[in-house]
Structures are given as structure tokens and as C-alpha cells.
């Protein structure tokens, strides 16, 4: 059995029991490796060295900077289970993507800045209900992510204009034209 001794000072357990103060006083660095039956048993440490080690441990336990990271970056909330049909199913009116849909979309290569609006979801559901195709829940979410990506990119990321609004004329005269 191999082991690593972390100090150059080694003593047998019998020698330590007979005169521990002298053994620790001669120890370089205030630490002695104590052997029993030719194997390391434990370390004997002087009170001064123990105080140094505890101070070092306390210093290392404190953060190195005053920047604190938000815990929610490390703790993902558990999504509440939703009754999703098993296997493949046709689109139905009450279908909803998962609560962590935006994160999942990012995993699929679709960066969505905003959550799905009710209008976008209603349009998606209406289209696919009419198609009558069947897919797994994850596949429906992937289709929704791609649909949102294409729909939002077609207008430069801006929401679609209402076709019923009356446009206002531009009253600015471009350079080079007379007014």
C-alpha cells in the first residue's frame, strides 16, 4: 500500500507517546507524521501551526472579490409536470410549450429574446390543427421555435404592423429636393 507523507518529519507512535512536547518542538514547520506498524497513522500538529492552518482555511473560504453571483444561475428551478400526451399526438387547442421553452430553444440553436406571445401560439396551433399531423411533444416545441425564429426574422425582429392602421405621410424633405 503506497501513501504520501506531507512532512519531512516522521516519528513512531511510541516515541510520540513518551515525549510529545520534545518531538513537536523539534518538528520542522510544526507538523510530524506519526507512524504505527510502518504505516502513516496520523499527523501531530503544534498549536501555533494549527492556528496558522485555521487562519489560512478561513482566508480561503472568503470570496476573493466583492462580486457575488446570483444563485439562480446555478440552481435551475424544477419545472412543474404538465399533463403532456405520451407518444405522438395531433395538435390540440390547449397545447402549451414547456415552462423552460426559451432555454430549450437555445439548446436547439434558436435564440429567442422574448417568450411566446398568445397570438403567436394561437397562430401556430391553428395552423397545425388544420394540418392534422402528429408529432412528439418535443418535436412540436422544436417546430414552434423554428416558426418563431422565421416569423420574427422576416420583419427584422419587429412586430408585424397592423394592416388596418392608416399610415402617416413623412413630412421630411430629403436632401437634394426642393420643398
From Swiss-Prot:
Keywords: DNA replication, DNA-binding, Primosome. One of its GO terms (biological process) is DNA replication, synthesis of primer. Involved in the restart of stalled replication forks, which reloads the replicative helicase on sites other than the origin of replication. Can function in multiple replication restart pathways. Displaces ssDNA from a PriB-ssDNA complex. Probably forms a spiral filament on ssDNA. GO terms for cellular component: primosome complex. The keyword DNA-binding applies. HAMAP family: DnaT (MF_01061). Residues 156-179 are annotated as: Disordered. Homooligomerizes. Interacts with PriB. Component of the replication restart primosome. Primosome assembly occurs via a 'hand-off' mechanism. PriA binds to replication forks, subsequently PriB then DnaT bind; DnaT then displaces ssDNA to generate the helicase loading substrate. The gene is dnaT. Belongs to the DnaT family. InterPro entries: DnaT, DnaT_DNA_bind. It holds the Pfam family DnaT. This is Replication restart protein DnaT.
Amino acid at each position: 500500500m503506497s501513501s504520501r507523507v506531507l512532512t519531512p518529519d516522521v516519528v513512531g507512535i511510541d516515541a510520540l507517546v513518551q515525549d510529545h512536547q520534545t518531538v513537536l518542538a523539534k518538528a520542522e514547520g510544526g507538523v510530524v507524521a506519526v507512524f504505527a506498524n510502518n504505516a502513516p497513522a496520523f499527523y501531530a500538529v503544534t498549536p501555533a501551526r494549527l492556528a496558522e492552518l485555521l487562519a489560512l482555511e478561513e482566508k480561503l473560504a472568503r470570496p476573493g472579490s466583492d462580486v457575488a453571483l446570483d444563485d439562480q444561475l446555478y440552481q435551475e428551478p424544477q419545472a412543474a409536470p404538465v399533463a403532456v400526451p405520451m407518444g405522438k399526438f395531433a395538435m390540440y387547442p390547449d397545447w402549451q410549450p414547456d415552462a423552460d421553452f426559451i432555454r430549450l430553444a437555445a439548446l436547439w440553436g434558436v435564440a429567442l429574446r422574448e417568450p411566446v406571445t398568445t397570438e403567436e401560439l394561437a397562430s401556430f396551433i391553428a395552423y397545425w390543427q388544420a394540418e392534422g399531423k402528429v408529432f412528439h411533444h418535443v418535436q412540436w416545441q422544436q417546430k414552434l421555435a423554428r416558426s418563431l425564429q422565421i416569423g420574427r426574422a422576416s420583419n427584422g425582429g419587429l412586430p408585424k404592423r397592423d394592416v388596418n392602421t392608416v399610415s402617416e405621410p413623412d413630412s421630411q424633405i430629403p436632401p437634394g429636393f426642393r420643398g
